[in-house]
Swiss-Prot record:
Residues 497-544 form the PSI domain. It holds the Pfam family PSI. Residues 33-684 are extracellular. InterPro entries: Ig-like_fold, Plexin_repeat, PSI, Semap_dom, Semap_dom_sf, Semaphorin, WD40/YVTN_repeat-like_dom_sf. PROSITE patterns: SEMA. GO terms for cellular component: plasma membrane. It comes from the Eukaryota. Glycans are attached at residues 121, 136, 314, 497, 608. It is found in: Cell membrane. The gene is SEMA4A. This is Semaphorin-4A. It comes from Bos taurus (Bovine). GO terms for biological process: adaptive immune response; angiogenesis; axon guidance; negative chemotaxis; neural crest cell migration; positive regulation of cell migration; positive regulation of excitatory synapse assembly; positive regulation of inhibitory synapse assembly.
Length: 762
């Protein structure tokens, strides 16, 4: 729209001048959420943000809520904390409710022994619960560090409540729980037997894979044969039909590298393994391990595995293992993380492939072809293995080929520590993989994997105001929530926050499989079961122009430029206004318009998304902040700006749109107050005014000092500015005394004190 010529009276000239100075002294604008490489969370909630409803459970005197177990019926969450085990009722909405709690502290004798071994009695010499699994419908099985003396026990259940632990049922837990609470570990119950991976000694230098409980014989890895490196660190155990897979990382022995190279592994042991009769007695006879490779082309690999889970989808013929990786190298000085998917078929295929063999003469690993032994060594065949097969297995436990994963999500500047996954069915009938990722700084990311096997981030929730790692994640599908364990308690996070999307287009652009637009209630809601086809969702493209095109959309589409509500700003002339633009999506780009034109030539600037405007004659009218996302543009907020001196009638095209008046004062140049947005720039105005006064004062002083200096220079003795005193070296006839035409500064005119002599009177 054409703008009238602006007259410059004294106040408007001063306002224009101060407005330009204000822009010079504004602090640097902040950049929104595009830190690092990889997908950006569309919506980010800071700690305490009221838009994201969270529930928090804590118990006075307890800490280190590290171990979580969901009951079979999904209504109870069992929690292993420091020296206590809790049962929480999670069926009711809101904060989880404590059913009961049983203490399980380390004995005083064990704590004294722990302190005697130079361990901290403030942070280490306690019983940290590390294993909490369901043994059957009436008992849990728990293990703890027990002040560096691991112990285990059965816990009886009665109506999902925990019965007290009997001391005579506490047994040694070596090999099932770590000694040190900081050591990583894993354990899983499969077919009534406990498979655990942990450190087996006080020093933390003897890793072990152990099978206990059940009817099968107790088996473990052979430490003498170095099947595992001394620094092996276990992160997950996943049972399959015939085998149990262990996921861990250790120092690589098969590669020559200029530094200590960490490598991620998957190992397998057969469930029907009974150990050897002569060789490998009470040892695994089916232990094999292979490299896990999670990398992008021409990039350093993500070689440190942090966690892994199996997506148990009954409809899938090829189950997938999803694992979180970081890198031991900080590329660009920042941490980076990746999520890779591994097919169980690919893992099985690698374990059926070629082996590696250590050449004892060169100390190098070489490829070994298939052995001429039947059944194949390491296979889950029935019956005892031959001595030839067992001899072969002692030295051929490493597979030649790696298991190559598919990168789904790669992000720099973040370190993922935990992972939970589920599938969600959309309106299109397709299943969509949803991942919940905990970070080392206390955030929770919700990611969705699209059809091209790449993930996008729906939201980021900062759980803690201060950085603190997520200790554990437990998904409760029947409750529609994710439970997050950390040092001080348990967070209950609803897995979707549909109500934050206020329009159909915002709901569709979010591409959250749990959310869809209900045209009847005109709200974005959780997708019901069974799915209603009349609801609006587009998981493939996120195109609101297509998804919201038909049916009653409420506050959704219509003419794109037509706002949903107009915020009326009635201000005085020459006032500095801030018109905020709520940036609900970090994936959108934002720009401002004035009517149907671009921002006018009136003094204005965009600062942190907000429009700073000096209101002058002709600068009123409709101001709109626009968002463009996924090639779709829509107005985010609309302002009708006019002055108190010359009210501007609302454009007839905007008739019928609800209006909201803004009544917050802002700076006015020349006195008075303006009505606009809630933030005041009065401090900036004062700063600019003071600086202007200082500049003017400095200029005035400079102007006055220059002539005074010239006058003073004329009054000085020519030649030397000052004459030395009598205590200094006497002046020579050539020093500083130049003959003058008037003869008043010759040596004969000076007395002994270097003073000018007067004329004698006769």
């Amino acid at each position: 729209m054409a703008l009238p010529a602006l007259g410059l009276d004294s106040w408007s000239f001063l306002g224009l001048f101060l407005f330009q100075l204000l822009l010079l002294f504004l602090p640097p604008a902040t950049t929104a959420g595009r830190e690092g490489q990889g997908p950006t969370p569309r919506v980010k909630y800071h700690a305490g943000d009221g838009r994201r409803a969270l529930s928090f459970f804590h118990q006075k005197g307890l800490q280190d809520f590290d171990t979580l177990l969901l009951s079979d019926d999904g209504g109870t969450l069992y929690v292993g904390a420091r020296e206590a085990i809790l049962a929480l009722n999670i069926e009711d909405p809101g904060v989880p409710r404590l059913k009961n709690m049983i203490p399980w502290p380390a004995s005083d004798r064990k704590k004294s022994e722990c302190a005697f071994k130079r361990k901290s009695n403030e942070t280490q010499c306690f019983n940290f619960i590390r294993v909490l699994v369901s043994f059957n419908s009436t008992h849990l099985y728990a293990c703890g560090t027990f002040a560096f003396s691991p112990a285990c026990t059965f816990i009886e259940l009665q109506d999902s409540r925990l019965l007290p632990i009997s001391e005579d049922r506490v047994v040694e837990g070596k090999g099932q729980s770590p000694f040190d609470p900081t050591h990583k570990h894993t354990a899983v119950m499969a077919d009534g037997m406990l498979y655990s991976g942990t450190m087996n000694n006080f020093l933390g230098s003897e890793p072990i894979l152990l099978r206990t409980l059940g009817s099968q014989p107790v088996l473990k890895t052979d430490n003498f044969l170095r099947w595992l490196q001394p620094d092996a660190s276990f992160v997950a155990a996943i049972p399959s039909t015939q085998v149990v897979y262990f996921f861990f990382e250790e120092t690589a022995s098969e590669f020559e590298f200029f530094e200590k190279l960490r490598i991620s592994r998957v190992a397998q042991v057969c469930k029907n393994d009974v150990g050897g009769e002569k060789l490998l007695q009470k040892k695994w006879t089916t232990f094999l391990k292979a490299q896990l490779l999670c990398t992008q082309p021409e990039q350093l690999p993500f070689n440190v595995i942090r966690h892994a889970v199996l997506q148990a989808d009954n409809s899938s013929t090829d189950p997938q293992v999803y694992a979180v990786f970081t890198s031991q190298w900080h590329v660009g000085g920042t941490r980076s993380s990746a999520v890779c998917a591994f097919s169980l078929k690919d893992i099985k295929s690698v374990f059926e492939g070629k082996y590696k063999e250590l050449d004892k003469e060169t100390s190098r690993w070489t490829t070994y072809e298939y052995p001429d032994i039947s059944p194949r060594p390491g296979s889950c065949s029935k019956g005892p293995s031959s001595d030839k097969a067992l001899t072969f297995m002692k030295d051929h436990f490493l597979m030649d080929e790696p298991v190559v994963g598919t990168p789904l999500l790669v992000k720099s500047g973040v370190e993922y520590t935990w992972l939970a996954v589920e599938t969600a069915q959309g309106i299109d009938g397709q299943s969509h993989l949803v991942m919940y990722l905990g970070t080392s700084t206390g955030s929770l990311h919700k990611a969705v994997v699209s059809g091209d096997h790449s993930a996008y981030l729906v939201e980021e929730i900062q759980l803690f105001p201060d950085p603190e790692p997520v200790r554990n994640l437990q998904l409760a599908p029947t409750q529609g929530a994710v439970f997050v364990g950390f040092s001080g308690g348990i967070w209950k996070v609803p897995r979707a926050n549909c109500s934050v999307y206020e329009s159909c287009m915002d709901c569709v652009l979010a591409r959250d499989p749990h959310c869809a637009w209900d045209p009847e209630s005109q709200t974005c809601r959780l997708l019901p079961t069974p799915i209603l086809k009349s609801w609006k969702q587009d998981m493939q493209q996120g195109n609101p122009e297509w998804a919201c095109a038909s049916g009653p959309m409420g506050r959704s589409l219509g003419p794109r430029s037509r706002p949903q509500i107009i915020k009326e700003v009635l201000a005085v002339p020459n006032s500095i206004l801030e018109l905020p633009c709520p940036q609900s999506s970090a994936l959108a780009s934002y720009h401002w318009s004035h009517g149907v034109e671009a921002i006018p030539e009136a003094p204005s600037t965009v600062y942190n998304g907000s429009l700073l405007l000096l209101l002058r004659d002709g600068a009123g009218g409709l101001y709109q902040c626009w968002a463009t996302e996924n090639d779709f543009s829509y107005p985010v907020v609309s302002y009708w700006v006019h002055s108190q001196d010359q009210p501007l009638a609302l454009d007839p095209k905007l008739a019928g749109i609800p209006r909201e008046r803004m009544e917050a004062p802002l700076t006015r140049v020349g006195g008075g107050a303006a009505l606009a947005a809630p933030k005041s720039y009065w401090p900036h105005f004062l700063t600019v005014t003071v600086l202007l006064a200082l500049v003017l004062s400095g200029a005035l002083v400079t102007f006055l000092v220059s002539p005074l200096g010239a006058l003073r220079a004329r009054g000085k003795v020519q030649g030397c500015g000052t004459l030395p005193s009598r205590e200094k070296a006497p002046l020579s006839s050539e020093q500083c005394l130049q003959p003058s035409k008037e003869g008043r500064t010759s040596a004969s005119d000076m007395d002994a004190d270097n003073n000018l002599q007067g004329t004698e009177v006769a």
